[in-house]
Curated annotation (Swiss-Prot):
Subcellular location: Cytoplasm
Function, in words: Catalyzes a mechanistically unusual reaction, the ATP-dependent insertion of CO2 between the N7 and N8 nitrogen atoms of 7,8-diaminopelargonic acid (DAPA, also called 7,8-diammoniononanoate) to form a ureido ring.
Species annotation: Afipia carboxidovorans (strain ATCC 49405 / DSM 1227 / KCTC 32145 / OM5)
The organism's taxonomic lineage, starting at the top: Bacteria, Pseudomonadati, Pseudomonadota, Alphaproteobacteria, Hyphomicrobiales
The protein's name in its UniProt record: ATP-dependent dethiobiotin synthetase BioD
Residue numbers binding ATP: 13-18, 101-104, 185-187
Catalytic site positions: 33
Requisite cofactors: Mg(2+)
Length: 210
């Protein structure tokens, strides 16, 4: 069976969409974001399509597109709907990899009763945890790692995003007992070519396919 990976984060806006674009492009994968909250600046799927270089048919349609950039449970309430977690089943396996991106951080509520991490636990797919490198990331990252391990979710490792703070990265991986997958540096301008080159330089693709 082809590689199927979940990408989540220690927090919102840590850079997991940019990382997902890089990973999906490098794997020549399909990409799926089951829940999109907020659409004023375009969807994450459109951003991944632009940055990954993947053809349009590789960007799979969202199950829910919510109008408000907020926690999915609240954004759905504003739109007058409730997210049914039974709708959040990964697409059938194909002969190519699949990258699934969550919304916000691991512990973001989908509805009044379920967190995203609960859905990930049900799927039992390997998870890549994205973390920022700035002040506060040690606490956020270790709490996230503990939550993933407590639910027996297979953890591929942690991908850092941001400037180089080697000591923070080292101590997170040592205490958390997780693999350091690499660090995606800030890119300006952020272009598909620059992202592809940075990913190839910073990560070992075999770490995601083993």
């Amino acid at each position: 069976m082809s590689t199927r990976l979940v990408v989540s984060g220690t927090d919102t806006d840590v850079g997991k969409t940019v990382f997902s674009a890089a990973l999906a492009g490098a794997l020549d994968a399909d990409y799926w974001k089951p829940v999109q909250a907020g659409r004023d600046d375009g969807t994450d799927a459109l951003r991944v399509a632009r940055l990954s270089g993947l053809p349009p048919e590789r960007i799979l349609p969202e199950r829910y597109i919510l109008n408000t950039p907020a926690s999915p449970h609240y954004a759905a309430r504003i739109d007058g709907i409730t997210i049914d977690t039974n709708d959040l089943t990964p697409p059938p396996a194909k002969d190519r990899p699949l990258v699934i991106e969550g919304a916000g951080g691991l512990m973001v509520p989908i509805n009044e009763d379920t967190l995203f991490i609960d859905v990930f636990a049900r799927w039992k797919l390997p998870l890549v945890l994205c973390a920022r490198t700035t002040l506060g990331t040690i606490n956020h990252s270790l709490l996230s790692i503990e939550a993933v391990k407590r639910r027996d979710i297979p953890l591929v490792g942690i991908a850092f995003i941001g400037e180089d703070y080697a000591e923070s990265e080292r101590i997170i991986c040592k205490i958390g007992g997780v693999r350091h997958l690499g660090r995606l540096p800030p890119l300006s301008p952020l272009t598909p070519e620059a992202l592809r080159a940075a990913f190839i330089t910073s990560f070992n693709l075999s770490d995601f396919t083993a």
